[in-house]
Each structure stands twice: as structure tokens, then as C-alpha cells.
């Protein structure tokens, strides 16, 4: 889904077309919850809570850092500890306020919760939606933009939703 949304186009119609293409090419039929998560550009944790009707939590499995980026692998778990989403994040520390980077380094909260709690004004740009036949999961890749710079690049695999 690397195509750009037409300037005078409708994001909803564009995403419907991309989801139809994904279903056709991969031979799968997506549930409404999966479609919602693929196109959503709000906080994934909040949307998952609404869709599942329960509290979800983020568990950071692995996190490493170099001078310019933090790489993170995490899962979002439902109330029965079932993995709903597996996320791989690349965080560009030079494009974020220090307090945000500090909270990320603590590994206690999900990125969406950190952004929401800090009232950081961001924009999410969906770069790709697809299907991984090996893992048998639908995924999306998106960027979170802060002050016109890419602050996060995230790939989410919808494993249990």
C-alpha cells in the first residue's frame, strides 16, 4: 500500500479499496475488527480496549538502543493474557522531546499511552497494509509524525484479533 492518497480523494474510500485488494491477493476474509485496526490512526491500545470490551496491556519483550534510535518489540495482551497484536517499533529519539524518550526507556507503557498521557500532538500515516502468509497474520506499517518529522515507525501484526 505504498500508493499515496489522492489529494482530493477520500481516505475511507481509498482504504476500502486497499483492504479489498489485500483480501483478493491473499485469499483471506478480514473481520470487521481487523479492518478497523488496519485503518485506524488513533491509539491502538484504546481501540483494542473498545473492540474487546476489556482492558489491554502492553508488554515490552525486547528493547535496544543506539545513538539515534530505540528498537522495541512488544505485544498487546487482552484480559486473558492472549496476544492480540505484536508490534515492532523504531523510535527516532532526536525527533522527540526528552520526557517522551525517558518514558519509552522505562519500558513500562505502550507508545500510544505515552503519547496520549503526554498530550503530544502527532499524526499517524499508514504506509502499508498486508498479509504475511508465513505467520498467517495481517499487518500494518505506519509512521507517527511529530513536528513534521518521523518520530516512530511501527509494524503491527494482528495476531489474535
Predicted features along the sequence, with ranges:
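Conserved catalytic block of serine-dependent lipid acyl chemistry
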Residues: 143
Amino acid at each position: 500500500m505504498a500508493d499515496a492518497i489522492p489529494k482530493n480523494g477520500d481516505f475511507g474510500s481509498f482504504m476500502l479499496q486497499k483492504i479489498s485488494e489485500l483480501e483478493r491477493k491473499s485469499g483471506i476474509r478480514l473481520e470487521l475488527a481487523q479492518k478497523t485496526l488496519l485503518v485506524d490512526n488513533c491509539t491502538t491500545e484504546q481501540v483494542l480496549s473498545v473492540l474487546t470490551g476489556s482492558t489491554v496491556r502492553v508488554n515490552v519483550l525486547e528493547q535496544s538502543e543506539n545513538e539515534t534510535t530505540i528498537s522495541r518489540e512488544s505485544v498487546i495482551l487482552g484480559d486473558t493474557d492472549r496476544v492480540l497484536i505484536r508490534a515492532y517499533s523504531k523510535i527516532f529519539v532526536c525527533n522527540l522531546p526528552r520526557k517522551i524518550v525517558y518514558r519509552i526507556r522505562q519500558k513500562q507503557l505502550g507508545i500510544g499511552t505515552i503519547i496520549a498521557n503526554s498530550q503530544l500532538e502527532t499524526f499517524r500515516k499508514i504506509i502499508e497494509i498486508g498479509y504475511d502468509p508465513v505467520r498467517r497474520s495481517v499487518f500494518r506499517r505506519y509512521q507517527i509524525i511529530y513536528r513534521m518529522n518521523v518520530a516512530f515507525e511501527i509494524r503491527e501484526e494482528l495476531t489474535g484479533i
